């Protein structure tokens, strides 16, 4: 009986199993047969038309095969289950979205839990503890996702600091095996530190991550997951397939971002399955569902509504400390304050407002603008609903056209709204080809709001407007003014475009130089002040040298000071700056700033350890009366040289063994100083010149003019800047011909630089016979140096003497190196340019090929300057911070500055006292002090050619006294001025009146003579001699 019952139970179980199996859909049977194969479920996805059926299939598969790698990452419970690689690239957007929406539907409850975590209030978060707890709760009860991890990381940094954040990442997030999730979490960690500018985050990621990957789509994925930027369908079609096996929460947020970023998706049926996803937004309690539905019929692609910044945007800006006024700069602090919102929780309505305002600052197309405004409207409608308010009745529709938008710029009470309208107008103007009108708007709007220039779409302008276009419209001075205000954001071509406009305006007025303009309007003044700067004039071929160009700017500034007295101080200050820098450069040119050096301290330490035994052995010979050469032989040798005798001087050698030791010590020292791979001259040549410095310096003039073609793995490409330039401007024949010529030239030029580096920038030795640095000693120098062994008290003293002799020898030989560079090498490089010029003429049939020929001429001039720089590098290095400079020369430099400022000032200057005094530090400060004193003489002496006597003396060990005495005409006035000045210096009133930068008059003197907290400057007059005295005591450590 028991056996029969057992048999019946077995039969019953088999029938139940058959019935359960028979209820499986064909898709589920295929999945079971393949044991959850990825290929099988992907095939089913592609074949299934019903989203609901696919969702049920995924739900069934997840319950049975959830530990398959491609499935476990959809709803990970631990960081190790986050995706460790990317699958399904090159999939279609439709198939990808089908999978994503079906997967999201399969875990709808978890999405609803995630949405409850979103912060939806307009109020700013002041305590992130609750946010941290909500993120951790989502991770514990829902799933791990990069969205929740990002929120947790940001909140943790805000509440417990960066160290706590990093410890959590290292202890709880990073996994041991190589994983894409580690890279994403690292990126998230950088972005979630708080108070980080997005561009700084991007720079870090570029350096350490993006530059390591050749796959552009993978980099795009990392960029998206880090920054959560606004999306459009084109970008989404690349990203969507890469996200298929990421946590479902992240896939959900990706689609939510897409459907609330791309204005074209305002109606749900634009994309396949779009309506299904919008229904998911609503069913899972997403705050974005209701606003999106409300906007479905209100969005119009050809126009937008104003005001752009309503009360919600105003509330956001106010809450993050941004003042909506003209004085408010949209600077780093502005960007960082916005970034804190969307780096914390990008799906929150506050983040939507912040990302919209941030995106408007960088929008380059109308599509970008529409995306930013759509996202903003989503948040606005949400807050209106929460506050139970309706849209303000004064809303108006504005067409996306330059004329319509430009008419609105400047009307709003909100400065940031005007800035956004200005950007939209400029985008419309550039897109419509209204370049002149756009630049006039730029000029006129930034007259009232200088900071508004940062809202100009510089990238779009650079990509759309050519030099020829600027030349065509440059007759209007407002073109040059406007361009000058955005030149920095236009990149390398910015100042060039400014000068093209300047040149065209000058041509229209029949002038060749800006100084010829008689400014009789505010536009003329702005043109000369802002467009005709040194940076702009440097682009001109009108000036033969930098000095001539700067003299032109100085003349322009003097002219401006006459017609614009309200800003006279600014103009004169710039003149001071230019002339002061010129004079300082001239002064510094008299002192070597070279790159030939070594680590004397390290080499001396080596010698004391390694060569002391040999020196001690030599000292034993010397003490025994057997020096290497006869005593005082070096003095006799110098006397012989100065006597003019023709016969050879003979050194007497008392002992050959003693001489051999001395020679060995000198040879080892010389070799170590010259060739030591770590501390010697050759090592520093490698660091300072061979390691790219000379190569880059000589390439730079040609690269700046796009003459050089960069080498690629397969060689030098024919497709270069000038090829594209001529083709784009309708001269295909020139473009196709010039490319190969420049490629050949670039290869020859790079080979020449390689030869310079390998053969010339070397210490000369047997394997480098062409090296320019010659450290070898003549036999007479060796024997003369050997005489010093008997004169020094110890080896340390001899090393010090050897160092002086070594550098004197090298310095003498460097003169030949500089001559070679300035003549032979310079000629060789110019011959390459001559050959290039000839080959371009032959290839194109043009004697002069503008604008390439102009670029080549500029490059040739700058290359000459670069060669001269390389020549000056071939000096023994002397730091101008520590190399003593003559005080007389410093004072003379200050006098020269003032005389160039005021050409009619011709003082008669004499120096007395310790005129040989040299000082070590604060060259610029001392020049400023004496410049102020000479300026006072010019302004107040009332003497045509005043006499000035400067007396200097070292009175005590740490003090330098200088008395500056000058002629004075009105003694009563001078005495009152002296009493007043002394009182102001005593009370510190001069210090209070000093601006943040610079200073003027005797205040500079007083400030520079502080000792024990008090100024050491005394001013007096001598009635008997009609002299004005300024007596100063400088503390040596200060100067």
Swiss-Prot record:
* Residue ranges, compositional bias (Basic residues): 1-19
- Region of interest called Disordered, as start-end residue ranges on this chain: 1-38
Q: Which UniProt keywords apply?
A: Plasmid
The protein here is known as Uncharacterized protein y4jQ
């Amino acid at each position: 009986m028991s056996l029969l019952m057992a048999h019946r139970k077995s039969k019953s179980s088999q029938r139940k199993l058959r019935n359960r199996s028979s209820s499986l859909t064909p898709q589920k049977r295929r999945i079971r047969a393949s044991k959850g194969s990825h290929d099988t479920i992907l095939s089913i996805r592609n074949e299934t038309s019903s989203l609901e059926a696919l969702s049920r299939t995924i739900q069934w598969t997840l319950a049975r095969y959830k530990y398959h790698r491609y499935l476990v990452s959809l709803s990970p419970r631990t960081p190790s289950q986050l995706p460790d690689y990317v699958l399904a690239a090159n999939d279609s957007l439709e198939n990808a979205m089908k999978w994503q929406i079906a997967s999201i539907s399969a875990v709808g409850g978890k999405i609803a839990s995630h949405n409850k975590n979103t912060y939806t209030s307009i109020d700013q978060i002041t305590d992130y503890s609750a946010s941290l707890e909500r993120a951790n709760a989502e991770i514990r009860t829902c799933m791990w996702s990069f969205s929740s991890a990002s929120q947790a990381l940001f909140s943790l940094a805000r509440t417990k600091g960066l160290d706590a954040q990093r410890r959590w990442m290292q202890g709880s997030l990073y996994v041991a095996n190589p994983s894409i999730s580690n890279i994403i979490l690292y990126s998230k960690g950088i972005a979630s530190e708080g108070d980080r500018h997005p561009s700084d985050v991007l720079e870090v990621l570029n350096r350490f991550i993006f530059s390591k990957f050749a796959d552009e789509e993978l980099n795009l994925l990392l960029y998206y997951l880090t920054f959560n930027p606004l999306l459009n369908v084109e970008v989404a079609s690349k990203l969507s397939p890469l996200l298929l096996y990421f946590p479902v929460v992240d896939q959900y947020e990706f689609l939510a971002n897409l459907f609330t970023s791309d204005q074209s998706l305002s109606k749900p049926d634009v994309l396949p399955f779009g309506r299904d996803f919008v229904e998911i937004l609503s069913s899972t309690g997403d705050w974005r569902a209701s606003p999106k539905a409300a906007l479905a019929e209100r969005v119009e692609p050809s126009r937008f509504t104003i005001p752009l910044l309503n009360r919600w945007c105003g509330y956001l800006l106010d809450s993050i400390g941004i003042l909506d006024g003209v004085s408010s700069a949209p600077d780093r602090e502005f960007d960082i304050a916005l970034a804190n919102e969307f780096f914390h929780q990008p799906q929150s309505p506050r983040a939507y407002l912040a990302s919209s305002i941030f995106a408007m600052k960088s929008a380059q197309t109308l599509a970008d603008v529409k995306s930013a405004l759509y996202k903003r409207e989503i948040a606005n409608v949400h807050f209106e609903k929460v506050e139970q308010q309706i849209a303000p009745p004064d809303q108006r529709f504005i067409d996306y056209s330059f004329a319509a938008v430009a008419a609105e710029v400047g009307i709003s009470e909100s400065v940031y709204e005007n800035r956004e309208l200005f950007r939209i107008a400029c985008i419309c103007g550039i897109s419509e080809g209204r370049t002149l009108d756009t630049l006039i708007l730029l000029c006129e709007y930034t007259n009232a709001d200088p900071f508004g220039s940062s809202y100009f779409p510089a990238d779009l302008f650079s990509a759309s407007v050519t030099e020829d276009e600027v030349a065509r419209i440059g007759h209007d001075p407002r073109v040059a003014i406007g361009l000058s205000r955005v030149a920095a954001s236009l990149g390398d071509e910015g100042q060039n475009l400014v000068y093209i406009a300047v040149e065209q305006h000058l041509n229209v007025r029949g002038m060749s130089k800006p100084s010829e303009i008689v400014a009789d309007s505010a536009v003329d003044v702005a043109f000369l002040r802002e467009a005709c700067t040194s940076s702009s004039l440097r682009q001109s071929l009108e000036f033969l040298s930098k000095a001539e160009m700067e003299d032109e700017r100085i003349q322009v500034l003097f002219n401006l000071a006459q017609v614009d007295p309200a800003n006279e101080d600014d103009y004169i200050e710039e003149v001071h700056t230019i002339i002061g820098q010129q004079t300082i450069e001239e002064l510094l040119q008299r002192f070597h700033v070279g790159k030939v050096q070594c680590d004397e301290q390290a080499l001396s330490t080596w010698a004391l350890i390694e060569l002391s035994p040999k020196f001690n052995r030599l000292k034993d010979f010397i003490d025994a009366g057997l020096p290497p050469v006869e005593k005082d032989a070096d003095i006799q040798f110098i006397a012989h040289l100065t006597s003019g005798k023709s016969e050879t001087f003979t050194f007497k050698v008392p002992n050959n063994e003693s001489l051999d030791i001395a020679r060995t010590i000198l040879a080892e020292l010389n070799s170590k100083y010259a060739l030591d791979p770590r501390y010697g001259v050759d090592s520093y040549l490698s660091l300072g010149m061979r390691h790219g410095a000379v190569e880059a310096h000589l390439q730079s003039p040609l690269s700046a003019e796009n003459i050089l073609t960069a080498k690629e793995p397969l060689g030098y490409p024919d497709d270069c800047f000038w090829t594209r330039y001529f083709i784009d401007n309708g001269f295909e024949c020139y473009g196709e011909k010039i490319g190969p010529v420049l490629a050949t030239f670039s290869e020859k030029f790079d080979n020449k630089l390689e030869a310079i580096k390998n053969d010339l920038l070397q210490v000369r030795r047997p394997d480098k016979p062409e090296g320019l640095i010659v450290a070898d000693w003549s036999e007479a120098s060796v024997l003369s140096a050997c005489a010093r062994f008997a004169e020094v008290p110890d080896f340390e003293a001899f090393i010090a003497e050897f160092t002086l002799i070594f550098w004197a020898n090298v310095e003498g030989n460097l003169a030949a190196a500089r001559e070679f560079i300035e003549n032979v090498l310079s000629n060789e490089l110019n011959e390459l340019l001559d050959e290039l010029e000839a080959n371009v003429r032959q290839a194109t049939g043009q004697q002069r090929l503008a604008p390439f020929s102009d670029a080549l001429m500029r490059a040739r001039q700058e290359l000459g300057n670069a060669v001269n720089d390389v020549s000056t590098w071939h000096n023994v290095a002397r730091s101008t911070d520590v190399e003593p400079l003559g005080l007389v020369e410093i004072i003379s430099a200050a006098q020269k500055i003032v005389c160039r400022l005021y050409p009619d000032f011709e003082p008669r200057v004499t120096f007395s006292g310790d005129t040989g005094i040299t000082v070590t530090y604060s060259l610029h400060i001392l020049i400023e002090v004496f410049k102020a004193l000479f300026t006072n003489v010019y302004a107040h002496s009332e003497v045509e050619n005043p006499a000035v006597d400067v007396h200097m003396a070292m009175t005590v060990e740490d003090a330098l006294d200088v008395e500056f005495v000058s002629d004075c005409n009105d003694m009563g006035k001078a005495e009152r001025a002296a009493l007043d000045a002394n009182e102001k210096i005593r009370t510190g009133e001069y210090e209070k009146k000093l601006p943040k930068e610079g200073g003027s008059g005797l205040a500079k003197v007083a400030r520079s003579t502080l000792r024990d907290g008090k100024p050491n400057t005394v001013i007096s007059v001598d009635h008997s001699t009609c002299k004005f005295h300024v007596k100063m005591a400088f503390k040596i450590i200060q100067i």
